[in-house]
Amino acid sequence: MTAAYANLFSTIAPKDFGRVAVLFGGLSAEREVSLKSGNAVLTALQSAGVDAFGIDVGADILQRLLSEKIDRAFIILHGRGGEDGSMQGLLEVAGIPYTGSGILASALAMDKLRTKQVWHTLGIPTPRHAVLRSEADCISAATELGFPLIVKPAHEGSSIGMAKVSSASELIDAWKAASTYDSQVLVEQWIHGPEFTIATLRDQVLPPIALGTPHTFYDYDAKYIANDTQYRIPCGLDAAKEKELMDLTAQACEALGIAGWGRADVMQDADGKFWFLEVNTAPGMTDHSLVPMAAKAAGLDFQQLVLAILAASVDADGKKEARG
């Protein structure tokens, strides 16, 4: 552990967190990942002595929240219904403190188009893009942006529904496929160069991780299944570029109102410029996940990490107006 990260450790006695509901599963396309993340978090909290129990979130969640004795909630739902502000809203109505970002920041970060609009307004570099609603939009985007491009559902995570395309026909096919996940589909310039992911914890930026994969990009298989994905930490940047990346990450997260914890995904082009893609407000916590890797580099093991995330919910008590 370096002195820079010494204040990340929770100083709260495990029993003082009260009864903690770990919210996982849900109904989104990322349900299976959330189940793995949730079980890992629940096991770590219970091993630390926290009075924690799990809720696999379903249609009865409002009734569960109102009928159970819950002192605070650890949100480890991925995707819609968990990262989009809706669960945060339910918890605020129920008067239950929770981990992570607030309603507005969660909704903004879940919406890739709105995220890009905020960043563009504030001068945070993000790839050029277009919204696809028709085949005509695909042709127009191809002319304006050129190839290759990457197609993304606007409200999905874990790279679900994403595809790299190199022709108009591929773009149209990818738009149709992405439309099965989301009514709003984006297409972005493809940035040639290395990819980085940078976690934040309690308003501090953790050591960046460089990603390497034989896949076309860091897709669902590379994230959760493959054993050939490469992670470099230290990330290989020189000190000045690493500081630039970490400073930009802090600005990008602050622009969206990210609180508690999160993870930004960034590309670097051939000229060394960084391009911000998105921020995850409840990132994965599986054995393949990136936030635990970054936390380990900062000196926190998995149990210490989940306690630090939970402690941030205490930091936010009574400060809901300051949350995003």
Curated annotation (Swiss-Prot):
Binds 2 magnesium or manganese ions per subunit. Mg(2+) 1 binds at D265, E278. Keywords: ATP-binding, Cell shape, Cell wall biogenesis/degradation, Cytoplasm, Ligase, Magnesium, Manganese, Metal-binding, Nucleotide-binding, Peptidoglycan synthesis. It is an enzyme of class 6 (ligase). The keyword Heme does not apply. InterPro entries: ATP-grasp (IPR011761), ATP_grasp_subdomain_1 (IPR013815), D-Ala_lig_Van_CS (IPR000291), D_ala_D_ala (IPR005905), Dala_Dala_lig_C (IPR011095), Dala_Dala_lig_N (IPR011127), PreATP-grasp_dom_sf (IPR016185). Residues 116-311 form the ATP-grasp domain. Its EC number is 6.3.2.4. One of its GO terms (cellular component) is cytosol. Mg(2+) 2 binds at E278, N280. One of its GO terms (molecular function) is D-alanine-D-alanine ligase activity. It is found in: Cytoplasm. The keyword S-adenosyl-L-methionine does not apply. It catalyses: 2 D-alanine + ATP = D-alanyl-D-alanine + ADP + phosphate + H(+). Its cofactor is Mg(2+); Mn(2+). ATP binds at residues 142-197. Pathway: Cell wall biogenesis; peptidoglycan biosynthesis. One of its GO terms (biological process) is regulation of cell shape. NCBIfam families: D_ala_D_alaTIGR (TIGR01205), PRK01372.1 (NF002378). Belongs to the D-alanine--D-alanine ligase family. Cell wall formation. This is D-alanine--D-alanine ligase. The lineage of its organism: Bacteria, Pseudomonadati, Pseudomonadota, Gammaproteobacteria, Pseudomonadales.
